[in-house]
């Protein structure tokens, strides 16, 4: 495995760094949010905003596919994430190290839940190398994140992809982790820019910034308050409709008990009365 991962690391680092513009005043953006919150569209928005910068996009989910046993692992998706985590994290860490050394502009895409690792592997090394730091964070209610993650999972199965199942329990834990990260960022001496976004209306709409700690015209006292009080976009009637559709899909393929546990938790979060005939 060590030999395989070394080869993959060299491949990824060369592919991502070679030919990138070197910046005398490099920018590192910590881009995060809960699963299914719309981080992919936020990456596009940031790239559009900073057209003059040639960002390296660092996303561990993309590196999982390079695992030597990926084709076998994808047949058991509940194990694939665990089995590929160490592999993808090793690639991420080395790519960050080399990108910082070369003064490349960086967008690091994560949930932002692993506060200590983010600080140690990315934030502090970047600051010491003269980087300007920003955090751009998607904020959606846990319930809407869970619903989006479940819908994405079903689409991946239908399309024959390697599905990424995300339990609601993981989303709830991630929410606490992001809160911790925001608190750490708010205490940083260099006072990084922190921007909070919510999803626009529609699956393919661009995220909307509703908080910026460098602007005064806001109803929120700090980034943490903005993150934990996002605008609610999905009404309960629409949520119930989506939940019913998900149940039908899961029943049609005899989904496992773990999936149904997450669905029950979703019903609780949305305040929906359970249909006992579905249990």
Report residues per predicted region.
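N-terminal pre-Walker A segment at the start of P-loop NTPase domains
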Residues: 1-20
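Phosphate-binding P-loop
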Residues: 18-26, 99-100
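The conserved Walker
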Residues: 34-35
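Conserved lysine of the Walker
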Residues: 39
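Hydrophobic positions on the alpha1 helix immediately C-terminal to the Walker A/P-loop
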Residues: 42
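Conserved nucleotide-sensing/catalytic segment adjacent to the nucleotide-binding pocket
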Residues: 52-124
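Conserved phosphate-donor/acceptor-positioning beta-strand/loop module used by diverse small-molecule
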Residues: 129-149
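Conserved GTP-binding G-domain of TRAFAC-class P-loop NTPases and closely related GTPase folds
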Residues: 147-277
């Amino acid at each position: 495995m060590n030999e395989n991962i070394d080869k993959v690391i060299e491949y990824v680092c060369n592919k991502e760094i070679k030919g990138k513009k070197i910046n005398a005043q490099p920018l590192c953006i910590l881009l995060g949010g809960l699963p299914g919150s719309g981080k992919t569209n936020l990456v596009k928005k940031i790239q559009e905003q900073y057209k003059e910068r040639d960002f390296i996009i660092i996303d561990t989910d993309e590196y999982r596919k390079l695992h030597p046993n990926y084709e076998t692992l994808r047949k058991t998706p509940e194990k694939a994430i665990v089995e590929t985590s160490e592999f993808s994290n090793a690639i991420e860490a080395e790519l960050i190290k080399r990108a910082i050394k070369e003064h490349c502009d960086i967008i690091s895409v994560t949930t932002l839940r692993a506060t200590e690792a983010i600080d140690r592997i990315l934030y502090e090394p970047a600051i010491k190398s003269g980087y300007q730091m920003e955090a751009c964070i998607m904020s959606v209610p846990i319930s809407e994140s869970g619903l989006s993650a479940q819908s994405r999972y079903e689409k991946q199965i239908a399309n024959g992809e390697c599905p990424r199942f995300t339990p609601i329990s993981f989303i709830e834990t991630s929410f606490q982790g992001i809160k911790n990260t925001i608190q750490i960022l708010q205490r940083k001496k260099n006072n990084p820019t922190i921007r909070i976004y919510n999803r626009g209306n529609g699956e393919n709409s661009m995220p909307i910034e509703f908080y910026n700690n460098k602007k005064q015209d806001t109803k929120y006292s700090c980034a943490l308050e903005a993150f934990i009080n996002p605008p609610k976009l999905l009404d309960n009637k629409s949520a119930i409709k989506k939940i019913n559709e998900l149940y039908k899909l899961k029943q049609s393929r005899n989904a496992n008990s773990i999936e149904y546990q997450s669905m029950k938790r979703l019903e609780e979060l949305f305040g929906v009365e359970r249909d006992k005939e579905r249990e």
